[in-house]
Amino acid sequence: MPKADIHPTWYPDAKVTCNGEVIMTVGSTKPEINVEIWSGNHPFYTGTQKIIDTEGRVDRFMRKYGMKEKTTGDKQDKKKK
């Protein structure tokens, strides 16, 4: 026999709300649950996700430290003159 008065109150129809709108009902120990993001307004699930085009790490390193591909040798010709 379980002990009396040690278990939390169970709410079988607890309301889950997002921005004041009731999204669903679940069983919980709280009568109301407020969430900021759920699958109905998350960009990944709604298809409004922005894909950021980032350059590769190697390209970024090469650009940052000036290690570009060798050219035809224009700089060497100027130094010899």
Swiss-Prot record:
Top-rank taxon, per record: Bacteria
Keyword terms: Ribonucleoprotein, Ribosomal protein, RNA-binding, rRNA-binding
GO function term, MF aspect, one: rRNA binding
GO CC term, one of those recorded: ribonucleoprotein complex
Keyword field contains Endoplasmic reticulum: no
Stated family: Belongs to the bacterial ribosomal protein bL31 family. Type A subfamily.
Function according to Swiss-Prot or TrEMBL: Binds the 23S rRNA.
NCBIfam families for the chain: L31, PRK00019.1, PRK00528.1
Entry protein name: Large ribosomal subunit protein bL31
Species annotation: Synechocystis sp. (strain ATCC 27184 / PCC 6803 / Kazusa)
